[in-house]
């Protein structure tokens, strides 16, 4: 597991890619909306960062969420 924080540019790039894959805006991926497509795109972003070895805490800090929110999303 990587202890460092994901860079803002990496998070932004992955958010753009997740948004394109789910046909939403990057701001929706980084936002708080609970529409199914927003949630799926957000989960895809978090999963990609987790697959690269970032901890749920570091992902949460990078996207402005609580680490348990990220952990719960990655369980499903």
Predicted regions and their residues:
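DNA major-groove recognition helix of helix-turn-helix
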Residues: 50, 63, 74
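General nucleic-acid-binding
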Residues: 1-17
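The DNA-contacting recognition helix of HTH DNA-binding domains
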Residues: 66-67
